[in-house]
Curated annotation (Swiss-Prot):
Assembly notes: Interacts with KEAP1; this interaction prevents the ubiquitination of KEAP1 by TRIM25, thus protecting KEAP1 from degradation. Found in association with PDCD10 and members of the STE20 kinases, such as STK24, STK25 and STK26.
Taxonomic source organism: Homo sapiens (Human)
Listed Polar residues bias regions: 107-116
Protein name: PDCD10 and GCKIII kinases-associated protein 1
InterPro entries: DUF4699
Length: 314
């Protein structure tokens, strides 16, 4: 019992690999592979294939033994061992089992039909997208399985309406908006558009204000010598007082040049000015008083000049 054939027979008897029925194909595909069991089974299958390749004469006995075991209803069916594929290197091979199930698949319990799940994820959401006849690949084929699973997970996420993809698209759109160039405002004054209209309106308002101020000043301050009944009482009073002051100064200068005899009209005019400031009469009365004062001043001047003429003639 120390030959290789006996060891292989013992491995078949004590370490059987259960092959599920065709009804459990999808469930077996939905199960996750166990890495430890995969490594063990891969070593066993590689050793068995090498033994069969080196000893082709013993294949007949293996076939008879396998057929006798398949006849027993209490023992599971064993997959037929084939030769090593030519394209594999380093002892790795692709094993195709019954119904497209590889020998590395772990047995599925008949009592529990729900898929298992661990920390590395589950195949339950992606197993239905994989065809049931697709074999599990060993060695270099595991990378292809990972790629297929990643692609199927991406499609499952998009079908379930996950918000991850829209959020990434929105963030990309926001980044594009942040990189949009903004044109700075010009430094020069623009005389077109709303800004130019505002400038024109401001200038027009300033011009109109200046005109109104000039007109108001002209209306409030009439030129010297213009005294009418249409002007306000306070304005006429101020201009009358100013004119009287000028006239009294002129008369006082004339009388000082002529002599001290004619000082009386100046005093009278001063008293008359105080009377005009203190009185609240009508403008007509003030104008009459002013005319009387002027007449008196002219009479005094004529009398003075007449007296001088008489002195000269004497």
């Amino acid at each position: 019992m120390g030959c290789r054939c006996c060891k292989i027979i013992q491995s078949y008897l004590f370490d059987p690999v259960q092959v599920p029925s065709p009804g459990y194909v999808n469930e077996v595909n939905s199960c996750k592979l166990d890495e430890d069991d995969t490594d063990k089974l891969k070593g066993k299958w590689s050793s068995e294939v090498l033994v069969q390749k080196n000893d082709p004469q013993r294949q007949g006995s293996k076939k008879t033994e396998s057929s006798s075991r398949t006849a027993d209803p209490w023992e599971p069916c064993w997959p037929h061992q084939g030769p090593l594929p030519q394209g594999d290197a380093g002892g790795e091979h692709h094993a195709c089992g019954v119904n497209g199930i590889g020998p590395a698949a772990t047995p599925q319990p008949t009592g529990n039909s729900s898929p298992t799940q661990d920390d590395r994820g589950s195949w339950a959401s992606t197993a239905n997208t994989v065809p049931p006849t697709q074999p599990f690949l060993e060695g270099g084929g595991t990378r292809k399985q990972d790629c297929v699973l990643l692609a199927s997970e991406g499609t499952q996420v998009m079908r379930n309406g996950d918000s991850r993809a829209p959020s990434e698209a929105e963030s990309f759109a926001l980044e594009v908006q942040d990189h949009v160039f903004q044109i700075p405002a010009p430094d020069y004054l623009q005389h077109w558009g709303p800004a130019g209209d505002n400038v024109d309106h401001n200038e027009k308002d300033c011009v109109f204000k200046n005109h109104t101020e000039d007109e108001s000043l002209e209306g409030i301050q009439p030129p010297v010598g213009e005294h009418g009944l249409n002007t306000p009482f306070s304005v006429r009073r101020s201009w009358d007082s100013l004119n009287e002051d000028v006239e009294t100064e002129v008369l006082s200068i004339c009388f000082n040049e002529k002599g001290p005899v004619h000082a009386m009209p100046v005093v009278d005019s001063g008293n008359r000015q105080e009377d005009t400031h203190g009185s609240d009469g009508d403008g007509d009365g003030e104008i009459v008083d002013e005319d009387a004062a002027v007449a008196e001043a002219l009479a005094a001047l004529e009398a003075a000049t007449a007296g001088e003429d008489l002195d000269e003639t004497d």
